[in-house]
Curated annotation (Swiss-Prot):
Source taxonomy: Eukaryota, Metazoa, Chordata, Craniata, Vertebrata
Residues spanning the membrane: 1-21
Organism, as annotated: Mus musculus
A Pfam family hit: MWFE
Name the record gives this protein: NADH dehydrogenase [ubiquinone] 1 alpha subcomplex subunit 1
Keyword set includes Electron transport: yes
């Protein structure tokens, strides 16, 4: 019957979801608790470079508040 395919479909779905979820958690763990930023356009790259300069430790994912900006 048609429902015999459901277990295989569920297993295949889980196997397709695991890499995406695990990648997000790995990036979050390695980037100080924040998800990885992707610069798809040049403006986003400029923002990441600005955040890197402002952070003071040369990493874009270390955030500083407005009180630390000169």
């Amino acid at each position: 019957m048609w429902f015999e395919i459901l277990p295989g479909l569920a297993i295949m779905g889980v196997c397709l979801v695991i890499p995406g979820v695990s990648t997000a958690y790995i990036h979050k763990f390695t980037n100080g608790g924040k998800e990885k930023r992707v610069a798809r356009v040049q403006y986003q790259w400029y923002l990441m470079e600005r955040d890197r300069r402002i952070s003071g430790v040369n990493r874009y994912y270390v955030s500083k508040g407005l009180e630390n900006i000169d």
